[in-house]
Regions:
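N-terminal signal peptide c-region/cleavage motif recognized by signal peptidases
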Residues: 4-8
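Immediate post-signal-peptide N-terminus of mature secreted/exported proteins
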Residues: 9-55
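Regular secondary-structure segments
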Residues: 30, 34-45, 76-90, 101, ...
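A structural signal for alpha-helix termini and helix-coil/disorder junctions
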Residues: 46, 63, 70, 110-117
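Long, amphipathic, charge-rich alpha-helical segments that form helical bundles/coiled-coils
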Residues: 56-96
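C-terminal amphipathic alpha-helix
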Residues: 89-117
């Protein structure tokens, strides 16, 4: 039992030891991806990666993972909103169509227009 507790603690230390930027909203997620992708692209384009390059990649992936998780959560919610619109259209529920439709359109418009970072 103690071994599993120690293993769990070690796993947490391994995966939560680098500072990262949170993505509280879709715009922040997009901007973090844009910025950190540039750094990742410049490193991965090198013929040979140094140990420092690999450490930098390790560090920046935490921020990229946070951004991707935010986008996944927002897209999942957009899918739920769209399904609500679909089902409400079958039941002729105007208020649900308008409310859920607005949420869906707001979320997807951010995807289509791209934020100004």
């Amino acid at each position: 039992m103690l071994t599993s507790v120690i293993a769990a603690a070690s796993a947490e230390e391994r995966y939560d030891h680098c500072p990262s930027l949170e993505a509280a909203d879709m715009k922040t997620a997009f901007c973090n991806i844009q910025s950190y992708n540039q750094t990742l692209a410049s490193i991965t384009a090198k013929e040979t990666l140094s140990a420092e390059d690999m450490v930098k990649v390790h560090e920046l992936t935490y921020t990229l993972e946070n951004a991707i998780m935010r986008l996944q959560a927002d897209l999942n919610q957009a899918a739920i909103d769209l399904e609500e619109v679909h089902q409400a259209s079958e039941r002729l529920e105007q208020s649900t169509i308008q409310t859920s439709g607005k949420r869906y359109l707001d979320a997807t418009s951010q995807l289509l227009s791209g934020p100004k970072c």
